Amino acid sequence: MSFQLNKAQQMALHDPLLSLTERERKHLQHSWAEPFSKKIFPYITEDRFSVLYSANPASRPNNPVNIYFGLLILREIFNQSDEEALNSLLFDIRYQYALHTTSFAEQPVSKNSLTNFRAAVYRYNQKHGIDLIQQEIEAQAKGFSKLLKIDGKTIRMDSLMVSSSCRKLSRLEIIYSTVSRFIKAIDKNTLPERFQAYLEENHYNDTIYRSRDEDLNGKIKKVLKDGLRLCHLYRKNKKIKQSEEFKLLSRMLKEQQGKSAKKIAPHSLQNPTDPDATYRKKGKKKHIGYTANLIEKFDDKNQMIEGYDLQKNTYSDQKFAEDTIKRLAEGTTTLVDGAYYSEEIAKKAEAKGIKMVPTNLVGGGKNSNADQFEIDEKEHLVIKCPSGHKPIHSTFKKGSYRAHFDKKHCSHCPLRKDCSAIKQKKSYLFRISEKTLHRCQLITKMGTSQYQELARKRAGIEGIPSALRRRYKIDHLPVRGVIRVKVYLGFKISAINCKRLIKGLANRHNLELSTLLCDHLLSLFSFQRTYQVKFAA
């Protein structure tokens, strides 16, 4: 199938729009379909997806990519299934108007079109490591930001856990399911007699459920032993060795063999039906699945999600912060919570001219008066204490400052109660690491009203994870695996952005009308006042 741009967007003589009454046309133009048709659909970049199709122009041309992409956005906006979205396109003129298909004799989407399009994107990502959906949605967000005049000088970030749709398994279930899947995938004629029992209908229930607690460790050892024998038996078979089932079996044995339950790593296999899902405990909640990161640019009136990512849930917020710093422009202010922040990350950001503003710090925000000591960080010397006394001597070694102060100054100092200097035999010792000093300085800075006013602006992004869960059902997706889940996440992000654009344009239009009306009224009143003054004279 060859790639072809969608050029058939002109109205035909038989276009159903021409048969609408004035009232129907007015309602259509005041619906969501109008801004989607004029401000969203025309800016979908079809060329980006040409790599999914054949370069041979003699082959059958593709159906319009921008219609697939636009319909997938509408599917998320209205929380529909593929079938419901297709039916809406077939019978709802608003969908056809939004996607410029009113003049088509047949709507160019069939039962499996959306599934096949997503599958093509998955395969391309697996082969080349390029997410075409993410590229398009992030480019789309930049265009929307320009339309709403969001400068993007200030951004905020937040992350959320995304649950896998796979079932939570016990350790025995993980081991058994992996071994059983491998056995069912190979040729039954080559399977040794001792493993034939795994093919029996009741073998799973007999192994997993019909057992006492004291039998559990024995069963785990037995199934692991069976898995190890299978691995040794088929490891020289090149075809089987390349299969997904053999790779999962090898991975499971490496992660589970010879280890107690407490020593199993969080990144270990949680369910063979979703190899990408990992385990993480965040706060008091346990999660199996992935973690998503959101980057939002905003101003006082509008917001736009300009970037996103999805990884296994063992991926930390600090890694997301490092990834984000690489893509941000100089002069950007980034509002984050404490999980994203570290001194090393702040230094990387500063080197690029990016300002990191944490709203809190991991481990709490308790402070001493250490930052009130005057310290020359270039010369690495403690100059004087908060009371103005110079140290007897000062050193800097292995990233820490050490300064000794005279007892006669410290013993009766009015600041002694809050001072971090430690009483010793001959002097008072002030000791602080460079990292702790910078933390104290930051905590003091975080207490200022100017800093708090800026930090409060981060709260606006915290509603997005809730919306993704409640409205967009991000924890109940029909697919598994990072690549597939990320595609669904991308269209949900695009749906949020499109709704924000439509709302933002409507608000701006209303504001412009209000301004025009106000100016008109002012001109009338101004004329009346001038006339009255002349008449009085």
State each model region's role.
Residues E84, S103, Q107, T115-A537:
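Anion-binding and metal-coordination hotspots
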Residues F36, L52-I67, L74-I133, F144, ...:
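Trp/Phe/Arg-rich N-terminal binding region typifying the photolyase-homology
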Residues R25, F41, N62-N63, G283-K284:
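Short secondary-structure boundary/capping segments within folded domains
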Residues M1-P57:
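Basic, low-complexity segments
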Residues E22-P35, P64, D158, D274, ...:
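Secondary-structure junction/capping motif
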